[in-house]
């Protein structure tokens, strides 16, 4: 599958700093999230590189996610069933009464990182998530800058 990432500037080096760590967001279509003319990259992935967020806890190695679920539960002050539901996208942060409305967007981004981390723990390169743009893919790009094709 061919996916696209747009950036406000040329990508020289990918690191694990920042909100989404080593994961970059990709879309099935070119999108713009910046006022400036974006730098557009494409990436080829196979279906076996990707797991859907909704399938994470159905994977045969889902028990490996126990620590990650506990970490999110503690961070958000929710039970582990709720944390799991957030990671697999069957529940939204907007459904959690203890999360203030003004914090919900930031928390939802934090949860997306946990979803990507879950996929990586299970041995996948990417996870398909749903966000305000529809289907999106969070792809582990650490050390893989050369795989980005400038469009």
Residues of each region from the PLM?
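GIY-YIG-like beta-to-alpha core
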Residues: 23-32
